[in-house]
């Protein structure tokens, strides 16, 4: 008996008439490498949205939640007289440890997908969007708050957090809430972490780092495996404030509901000294980024002197900054800061001098003449 021929899978064949009609409908026809005139029909793929959070200023902020799907009356049972939208509770009512507040969060922010520019980027000193951090913003690029991660140069008043909420002197008894103005706190307490078999094998540190490093630079992470607790320290306090709201009532990889609080102060003197040193470094780095780069190079000794100065004269910092901003004005660049000067009115008989400041042409000429006179007098005495 002869064997049955094996079935051969072939690509669908499209005639030229069908191919032309398909192209008119917005479908791309790709020529195959076969010697025949068979063609494969393939739909056009949509352009993917960039997921680089550093390019947030080149794209519009994404609407995280459809406004029509938001229930405006989604509130906890009324136990007070005034409803606080910031804390999702009634004044004098339920605590955060009750069952209602321990449910998993309705949304989660994704910096790579959701960040973008909003109306707030045009307003200096704008605050960050609290609902964006929670993944529940319905405004998108029309929002009046920032939709991005905080950076080192984002500085706010000590009496408010990065979302514009008022802070108080003392922490709450449960170390929750907005925080305190009594000290700079960069460390978060993360509780109720589910310790699975994989976590016991040593993967819990990687899991915590992967979830919390999305909200900014992390200095260190300490995980207590036997208690299901972690302490996450960020590089800046604003990143810790953002991460606290972003990870509140979220889960890691096991579906748990996290308990995120502010960490208490470490009593170790070495840890306190390390914290103080880190805060000073952050302040110096923030000031360095706000100053002109040429000025920073001169302060750190990396720049060459643009012109020779008089012997024995050392230019102070204010004169350096004025000279650098004058150079930026001459080059057509926008100066970092406007320096206001009061110039004396020119004499009618003398031409108007374009030089300003203490060491103009006439002053330098007088100093050179005085220096030459002193040298001549010293030679005569010898």
Curated annotation (Swiss-Prot):
Keywords, alphabetical: Cell cycle, Metal-binding, mRNA processing, mRNA splicing, Nucleus, RNA-binding, Spliceosome, Zinc, Zinc-finger
Zinc finger (C3H1-type): 124-150
DNA-binding recorded as keyword: no
Localisation per UniProt entry: Nucleus
A GO cellular-component term linked to this record: Prp19 complex
Pfam families: RRM_1 (PF00076), Torus (PF16131)
CDD domains: RRM_cwf2 (cd12360)
A molecular function GO annotation: U6 snRNA binding
Database matches in InterPro entries: Cwc2/Slt11, Cwc2_RRM, Nucleotide-bd_a/b_plait_sf, RBD_domain_sf, RRM_dom, Torus, Znf_CCCH, Znf_CCCH_sf
Domain RRM: 186-265
Main localization (coarse): nucleus
Protein name: Pre-mRNA-splicing factor CWC2
Organism per entry: Yarrowia lipolytica (strain CLIB 122 / E 150)
């Amino acid at each position: 008996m002869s064997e049955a021929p094996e079935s051969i899978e072939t690509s669908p064949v499209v005639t030229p008439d069908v191919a032309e009609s398909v192209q008119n409908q917005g479908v791309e026809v790709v020529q195959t490498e076969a010697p025949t005139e068979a063609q494969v029909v393939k739909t056009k793929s949509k352009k993917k949205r960039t997921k680089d959070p550093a390019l947030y200023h080149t794209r519009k902020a994404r609407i995280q939640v459809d406004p029509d799907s938001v229930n405006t009356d989604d509130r906890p049972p009324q136990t007070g007289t005034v409803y606080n939208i910031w804390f999702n509770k009634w004044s004098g009512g339920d605590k955060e440890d009750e069952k209602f507040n321990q449910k998993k969060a309705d949304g989660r922010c994704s910096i790579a997908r959701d960040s973008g520019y909003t109306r707030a980027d045009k307003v200096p000193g704008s605050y960050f969007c609290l609902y964006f951090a929670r993944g529940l913003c319905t405004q998108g690029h029309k929002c009046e708050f920032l939709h991005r991660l905080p950076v080192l140069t984002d500085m706010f008043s000590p009496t408010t957090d990065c979302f514009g909420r008022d802070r108080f002197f003392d922490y709450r008894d449960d170390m929750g809430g907005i925080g305190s103005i009594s000290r700079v706190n960069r460390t978060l307490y993360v509780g109720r972490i589910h310790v699975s078999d994989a976590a016991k094998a040593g993967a819990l540190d990687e899991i915590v780092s992967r979830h919390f490093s999305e909200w900014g630079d992390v200095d260190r992470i300490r995980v207590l495996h036997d208690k299901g607790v972690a302490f996450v320290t960020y590089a800046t306090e604003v990143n810790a404030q953002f991460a606290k709201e972003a990870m509140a009532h979220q889960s890691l990889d096991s579906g748990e509901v996290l308990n995120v609080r502010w960490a208490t102060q470490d009593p170790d003197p070495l840890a306190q000294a390390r914290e103080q040193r880190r805060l000073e470094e952050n302040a110096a780095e923030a000031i360095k980024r706000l100053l002109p780069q040429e000025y920073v190079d001169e302060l750190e000794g990396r720049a060459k002197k643009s012109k020779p100065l008089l012997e024995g004269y050392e230019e102070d910092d204010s004169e350096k900054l004025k000279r650098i901003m004058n150079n930026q004005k001459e080059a057509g660049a926008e100066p970092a800061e406007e320096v206001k000067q009061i110039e004396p009115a020119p004499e009618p008989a003398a031409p108007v001098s374009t030089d300003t400041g203490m060491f103009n042409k006439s002053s330098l000429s007088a100093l050179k003449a005085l220096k030459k006179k002193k040298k001549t007098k010293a030679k005569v005495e010898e």
